[in-house]
């Protein structure tokens, strides 16, 4: 399997909506999504930026089956918020350095 970076830039999203989405993901049993190695979310201008590292595109797509309906219910337009998926070339994890 090839690790991938998944990036979302979601127009108009706020931290409040982002937190609500995570609450819904937890209710759906996705507190720790299978295959997700790393996740960050932050306000970037008028957009909400999400950057993930996933074990594989297949793992992300499986999670997307739960995520996408939650995003739509939160008012996110899937057409303007499509993820950019890029294969990982190199990954450094400081937690693994002793």
Residue ranges and their predicted role:
Residues 1-51, 55-69, 76-98:
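Short S/T/G/P-rich N-terminal loop/turn motif that feeds into the first structured element of a domain
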């Amino acid at each position: 399997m090839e690790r991938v970076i998944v990036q979302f830039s979601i127009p108009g999203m706020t931290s409040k909506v982002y937190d609500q989405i995570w609450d819904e993901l937890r209710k759906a049993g996705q507190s720790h999504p299978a295959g997700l190695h790393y996740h960050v979310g932050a306000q970037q201008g008028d957009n909400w930026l999400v950057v993930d590292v996933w074990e594989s595109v297949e793992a992300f797509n499986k999670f997307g089956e739960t995520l996408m309906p939650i995003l739509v219910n939160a008012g996110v337009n899937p057409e303007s918020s499509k993820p950019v998926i890029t294969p990982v070339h190199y990954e450094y994890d400081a937690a693994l350095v002793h």
